[in-house]
UniProtKB/Swiss-Prot annotation:
Binding site for GTP: 75-82, 176-180, 245-248
Protein name: Interferon-induced GTP-binding protein Mx1
Mode of membrane association: Peripheral membrane protein
Residue ranges annotated for the Dynamin-type G domain, each copy included: 65-338
GO BP annotations, alphabetical order: defense response to virus; innate immune response; receptor internalization; synaptic vesicle budding from presynaptic endocytic zone membrane
Start and end residues of each stretch annotated as Bundle signaling element (BSE): 339-364
Domain GED span(s) in chain numbering: 570-658
Region annotation (Critical for lipid-binding) ranges: 551-554
């Protein structure tokens, strides 16, 4: 707190960091006049729950599934990033040359509103350690980095969590990222620059992240890599805050340029800039405490002729920065909570659906395994029944198997129609050829039955191979559909899936052969020219009635040109051909699909279901059949863990007072 003399005291529980977000006025202005207990009550109700909620979700590992609101701290090497974090947290963090931050550090600062003593905790991997003295933090962070990234200069994406609880810290959670390096030095990997940028981009790309860019005042802001990276992912500066450091190192005469940058007049960011003066190396050597450094910082800005205006505007000092960041984080969390809740709900439903595909764990007891296998096979058989009866569930952009088969049957009817729809001229030539070859002692005008019979047999024979081709096409479709059902039900059980697939193939070859035999038998029978008298007479009558209507226009005129008085029987033969073809078409277009449906859908499905039930008889194979893929177990375990995380996250969001 700043006392009436402008001095910062250690004893005040409010610390040097002033609350914002409706709980206090901006730093540098007078404190609000509400009673302290009212302020604490509002603080407990609004500020801490927001940050605790996100911290708890991050601790659950929810960030593995979706992005959480966060403030990421980035900066070039030697930008003063560590000094800023030290000033905010009140603890010494690793310092030195080269890459000091080698793992992302989640810095959780928790303000204690009473006189409780300082306490800290470092967590990483499966390790957790309580810290009772702030001086131990730097050592423990270095140990953690060495354990994760190895001793040296390598970096890692794995998080280290540092929790600091004290009356003298703001309520804030920051993610400290490695400093940006351009050239590998010492034993650093050759691509250390690429590795570092890749790690930083992983965080700053997320729309849920506020980017805190640390830039020294004594460099050209346009040349800093950190700001360039932030602008690349946030070109409008909507979620970027600039932090200017080392104002005491600015060359004389360039102070006004720094003020212009801080006042957002040079490189515009919607969230603007803050400026701070942290402990330098000389201060550390002189053992200047962080509290003393805060007082020195305030004195520096109050006494500086150029930078004093920034203090008056609330843009300067670490306490102002702390309040600003707390306010930004709370606002950002409240803004993103509805979307976060929606994303968690959607992910929960998606993972639940995915987990159902992997089924439940295989029981350990033998009798339970028997029932488990029965359930799996019954579910498979039920899906086969639904498929063969045209009642299976399909997605919005898919169609049922029976619909696909019906389309093939429709194509078959078009093939028949096309083969039988020869033009009159072509038929006349064909009839004339057969008349010249087979006509006996009949007088002109008498129909030669042999000619009629040969033409009909030949036309029907030409349909046999297309019918067999249709059989093979539909058989492949049914086999693929059965295999898909097998995969959907048994994919996690390699042996059961392989056994089922083998049965599907074996039954397919067997029934396809029988169906082809029946189809060829049908076409052999079609070589017997036969039709019920009454049926044929009706068909012939219809053809002749149609013929009479167009006799003057087409048939007679064409016949008079195509045939002489010697071949006056052509029109009669043509009419008989049309009449018989109508009835043959009805038989073939219906009977061939019936054969295919019977063998390739009905019998195929029934035989497969029976063979699957027979697997239950051999108890010795149950363990073998239910042997899971190792990746299936791992995937199911992973999905269950994700589901548990998201379920806890949903419960915590539901309890959040909002």
């Amino acid at each position: 707190m700043v006392n009436s003399k402008g001095k910062i005291t250690d004893s005040d529980p409010g610390s040097s960091h002033l609350l914002l977000n409706g709980l206090a006025d901006k730093a540098g202005k007078n404190q609000d006049t509400e009673p302290e207990n009212s302020l604490c009550s509002q603080y407990e109700e609004k500020v801490r729950p927001c940050i605790d909620l996100i911290d708890s979700l991050r601790a659950l590992g929810v960030e593995q599934d979706l992005a959480l609101p966060a403030i990421a701290v980035i900066g070039d090497q030697s930008s003063g990033k560590s000094s800023v974090l030290e000033a905010l947290s009140g603890v010494a963090l690793p310092r030195g040359s080269g890459i000091v931050t080698r793992c992302p550090l989640v810095l959780k600062l928790k303000k204690l509103l009473n006189k409780d003593e300082w306490r800290g905790k470092v967590s990483y991997q499966d390790f957790e350690m309580e810290i009772s003295d702030p001086s131990e933090v730097e050592v423990e962070i270095n140990k953690a980095q060495n354990a994760i990234a190895g001793e040296g200069q390598g970096i890692s994406h794995e998080l280290i969590s540092l929790e600091v609880s004290s009356p003298h810290v703001p309520d804030l959670t920051l993610i400290d990222l490695p400093g940006i390096t351009r050239v590998a030095v010492g034993n650093q990997p050759a691509d250390i620059g690429h590795q570092t940028k890749k790690l930083i981009k992983k965080y700053i790309l997320k729309q849920e992240t506020i980017n805190l860019v640390v830039v020294p005042c004594n460099v050209d802001i346009a040349t800093t890599e950190a700001l360039s990276m932030a602008q690349e992912v946030d070109p409008d500066g909507d979620r970027t805050i600039g932090i200017l450091t080392k104002p005491d190192l600015v060359d004389r005469g360039t102070e006004s340029k720094v003020v212009d940058v801080a006042q957002n007049l040079v490189c515009h960011l919607k969230k603007g800039y803050m400026i701070v003066k942290c402990r330098g190396q000389q201060d550390i050597q002189d053992q200047v405490t962080l509290t003393e450094a805060l007082q020195k910082e305030r004195d520096f800005f109050e006494d500086h002729p150029h930078f004093r205006v920034l203090l008056e505007e609330g843009r300067a000092t670490v306490p102002c920065l702390a309040d600003r960041l707390t306010s930004e984080l709370i606002t950002h969390i409240c803004k993103t909570l509805p979307l976060l809740e929606k994303q968690i709900k959607e992910n929960y439903e998606k993972i639940t659906e995915e987990l159902q595909k992997y089924g439940s764990d295989v029981p350990e007891e033998e009798h339970e395994k028997m029932f488990f296998l029965i359930e799996k096979i019954n579910a498979f058989n039920h899906d086969i029944t639904s498929l063969t009866e045209g009642e299976e569930f399909v997605g919005e952009d898919e169609c049922r198997l029976f619909t696909k088969i019906r389309n093939e049957f429709h194509k078959w009817s078009l093939v028949i129609e096309k083969r039988f729809q020869q033009g009159y001229k072509a038929i006349c030539k064909q009839i004339e050829r057969f008349e010249n070859r087979y006509r006996g002692r009949e007088l002109p005008g008498f129909v030669n039955y042999k000619t009629f019979e040969i033409i009909i047999k030949q036309q029907i024979k030409e349909l046999e191979e297309p019918a067999v081709y249709m059989l093979h096409t539909i058989t492949d479709m049914v086999q693929a559909a059965f295999t898909d059902i097998s995969e959907a039900n048994f994919a996690e059980f390699f042996n059961l899936y392989r056994t089922t697939k083998s049965k599907i193939e074996d039954i397919k070859f067997e029934l396809e052969k029988e169906a082809e035999k029946s189809i060829r038998l049908h076409f052999q029978m079609e070589q017997i020219v036969y039709c019920q008298d009454q049926v044929y007479q009706c068909a012939l009558q219809r053809v002749r009635e149609e013929s009479d209507k167009e006799k003057d226009k087409k048939i007679n005129s064409m016949c008079s040109k195509e045939v002489s008085s010697v071949n006056i029987s052509l029109s009669d033969i043509f009419e008989h051909l049309l009449a018989y073809r109508q009835e043959a078409t009805n038989r073939i277009s219906s009977h061939i699909p019936l054969i295919i449906q019977y063998f390739i859908l009905q019998v195929y499905g029934q035989k497969l279901q029976k063979d699957m039930l027979l697997l239950l008889h051999d108890k010795d194979t149950h363990n073998w059949l239910l042997k899971e893929r190792s990746d299936t177990r791992d995937k199911r375990k992973l999905l269950k863990e994700r589901l548990a995380r998201l379920a806890q996250a949903r419960r915590r969001l539901a309890k959040f007072p909002g």
